[in-house]
UniProtKB/Swiss-Prot annotation:
InterPro entries: 3-IsopropMal_deHydase_ssu, Aconitase/3IPM_dehydase_swvl, AconitaseA/IPMdHydase_ssu_swvl, IPMI_Swivel, LeuD. This is 3-isopropylmalate dehydratase small subunit. It comes from Listeria monocytogenes serovar 1/2a (strain ATCC BAA-679 / EGD-e). The gene is leuD. Signal peptide: none annotated. GO terms for cellular component: 3-isopropylmalate dehydratase complex.
């Protein structure tokens, strides 16, 4: 997993509440087994018109927002089915940070396990961040747990374990390898019985 200590990036806002995983990545695109290639289908039914041309009214299609790496959204983001593909699609599109009012528990875990930092902020803060000009950057300071912008600095909470994983770029396998000596010692002990 790629580490995130301080992330500086552009934002795009999609302030709808209850965006479910079917809207994030429609089930018709889940036939592949790789974790990559899903970004082009992110929010597919909203991003594209029936003729597959980009919907000019959808925020991700705005020319000044196409480099965004921070998604600002509503309440209960990632609700619905528990497909991990939703986190893969967000990351593959290039989102490293999602700022929402709340998340589905399973979706939150899928994000943390796949390198997408889910942050919870109150609606007022998100509404202010959503109005930031396209040319402005927002800073995510993970060690100090702050979202820093021209419209304010907002503290956020994150579990210490997840914070450590993001700061050090550790996934579950890397954490397991941190304990390899203990694992080998245990295996030798069991083998000798």
């Amino acid at each position: 997993m790629e580490e995130i200590k301080v992330h500086i990036g552009k934002t795009v806002a999609l302030m709808n509440d209850n965006i479910d995983t079917d809207q994030i990545i429609p089930k018709s695109f889940l036939k592949r087994i790789e974790r990559t290639g899903f970004g082009e289908f992110l929010f597919d039914s909203w991003r594209y018109l029936p003729n597959r041309k980009p919907n000019p009214d959808f925020p991700l299609n705005a020319l000044d927002r196409q480099e965004a790496t921070i998604l600002i959204t509503g309440e209960n983001f990632g609700c619905g089915s528990s497909r991990e593909h939703a986190a893969w699609a967000l990351l593959d599109y290039r989102f490293r940070v999602i700022i929402a009012g709340s998340y589905s528990d399973i979706f939150y875990m899928n994000c943390t396990k796949n390198g997408v930092l889910p942050i919870v902020l109150p609606r007022e803060a998100r509404e202010k961040l959503a109005k930031i000009a396209a040319e402005e950057n927002v800073t995510i300071d993970l060690p100090n747990q702050q979202v820093i912008s021209s419209v304010g600095t907002y503290p956020f909470e994150i579990d210490a374990t997840w914070k450590n994983k993001f700061i050090n770029g550790l996934d579950d396998i890397a954490i397991t390898f941190e304990h390899i000596d203990a694992i080998k010692a245990y295996e030798q002990k069991v083998d000798s019985i």
